[in-house]
Amino acid sequence: MRRPALLASLLALLIAACGPIGLQAHTISLAYKSGDTYRYALHVALKYTVGAQGLSVPINLDMSGKETVKVQSVDSTGTADLSINLTDLSVKTTVNGTTNTTTTTTTTTVEVKVGRDGRIVSVNGSAFGSSGSLPGMVGADGGLVSAILPDKPVKPGDTWTKSYDQTNPMHSTGAYHVTTDNKYLRDEKVGSVNTAVVESKINADLDLTFDLASLNGQGGSSLLPTSGGSAALKGMSMKGTTKSDVTTWIDLGARRIVKSHSTGTIDAMIDLNMAAGATTPGLSGPITFKGTQTLDMNPV
């Protein structure tokens, strides 16, 4: 009769000494390898509203396609140069009630630098191709998003914070100031892959200036007017905030992104920089820019 009680006491002591069984801390930061290739199905949905002089213009975009991510190189800090090719894009845009749908088999290529903690260091190009030229959430224009990962081993339930500045995003002069609250939610299997599920709540203050060359360099059908006084447009400035909730599944073995889901909002004010004495019909500033965005990367 005493033996079961003794065994139970010993087990209780072991648990108290060793902590919860199975909740071992491990490293979940990214560890890409040069030459690796990963494929995803990409879906992006934007719902923006642009307001000026009492007018409100809804702008919606829904895009889906295939995404191939190739690791070009990895430096000594773990920052990876990724080449992202997007194909079979289907894009539906609705501006003020008028809908346009396009499909293409041509390839859009975006170059992205991503740190080992998942932060997007830089983006050259746009996943949205010719579908628009105003910025959205932090890093999302590259077609790849990640939760912000810890620098040290962690276990499910652990939390951490990070803040950083991302300078000159989207061919602009200026910066995002980013603060993040992050949590290792759980371990979960995605198909046959063991993953760590990490959630990041990301807030960013943005203060950006675009000159005309950088606006044209983004390509696409600008949301700014293309006739009349717009010929005198020299650039624009944007100030505001973005908020994102990003959940990412990290391969515990290969330490790469298995899939990612992001939702977010933007609330910004835009001022147009016109040549002296010139005006832009229908869009004299300031202009409000608000909306929501979702992005999903799923393995294929």
Give residue spans per PLM region.
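Bacterial N-terminal signal peptides
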Residues: 8-17
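Signature of exported/secreted
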Residues: 20-300
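Bacterial N-terminal signal peptides that target proteins for export
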Residues: 1-8
